Amino acid sequence: MTGFDAFKNFEKDGWEERASTYGNWAVTSQIVPVAVEALNLSSNDNVLELASGPGYGTSEISKKTKNVLGTDFAKSMVVEAKTLFPNLNFEQADAENLKFEDNSFDKVFCTFGILHFAHPDKAINEVRRVLKSGGIFVFTVWASVQESPFFGILSEVISKLGSFDVGLPDGPPIDDF
């Protein structure tokens, strides 16, 4: 494996294992309605969600347009989303290598997914490619340790009582965005 391939496999395997329990953690889904508003949707918009997980964002988007596709690189997340939202469209896709034609979507949406991509720059280039001219890309990320009291406290506790070196594969910097 080269570069961040080990990180990509680690992330994919982790999300495959957590698909059925991810919905129990309502932390990230709380931002979905606010982030969807930022898309400024109209009823005829064609929307792509990346890293859709169990489909909460896709479901919220579907309230404003029926042309929405949720995607995730973890097959079990796609299965979970289809179970929770059987009337919506989901498919497995790699955000870093999308199979869609250029200029296919009016809007692209991704909540807290970018930090799980081994090559976020590739994913953003793919968004640029599949997004129509004048389209909108809305994404969310966690605030940096310096800006987030929660992550600051967590970082301080780990530094004092443990170690950040827990054998995780190298990945892109978590606060690049």
Predicted regions and their residues:
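Conserved class I S-adenosyl-L-methionine
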Residues: 1-45, 56-60, 77-80, 84, ...
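A short SAM/SAH-binding and catalytic strip from SAM-dependent methyltransferases
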Residues: 107-120, 143
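Class I SAM-dependent methyltransferase SAM/SAH-binding core
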Residues: 48-98, 122
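A short acidic, Gly/Pro-enriched loop at the edge of an enzyme's catalytic core
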Residues: 96-108
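Conserved catalytic/acceptor-binding region of the Class I
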Residues: 122, 128, 136-177
